[in-house]
Amino acid sequence: MKRQLIIIFTLALSSLAFGLEEGKIEVKVKCVISGDEIDKEEYTKYKDGKVYFCCGGCKSDFEADASKFTTAANYQLVATGQYVQGSCPLTARKNKADKVVAVDGVSVTFCCNNCLKKAKKSTDKVSMLFSDVTFDKSFGKPNSDAIKTNVSKKKSAKK
């Protein structure tokens, strides 16, 4: 129940903070390649979402070798509300709502004070928390099986 409330709270906060509307992006999202403001017409599919770019050139660079930009792309998926956090990005354990750090406008929650301290000490929080390793185990589409499976695995592991 607490996990569902955290997910609902995160979704509500994301919607309010970023002013997302269906089919529109009003967030000041930056291009994952150049860091410039995006053109909402320039995007490509990535994982189960869309990554936005400032121009067709950056889009082509990403499509040619996305591996160089996965951390920034993962961050953008969360910043635009296409993905939500389901567990602690460092341990994949259940989050606690009061263990939170803001990463460039995105709230990331943790399971304990140790993980929170590690994140706060990091000089590159985006790389630490949105790399493919941490992203794949801790983030998923809202109401997705990935989020539900992650919760189920932890519960069954305790038995």
List each model region and its residues.
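Intrinsically disordered, low-complexity terminal tails/loops enriched in metal-binding residues
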Residues: F18-K159
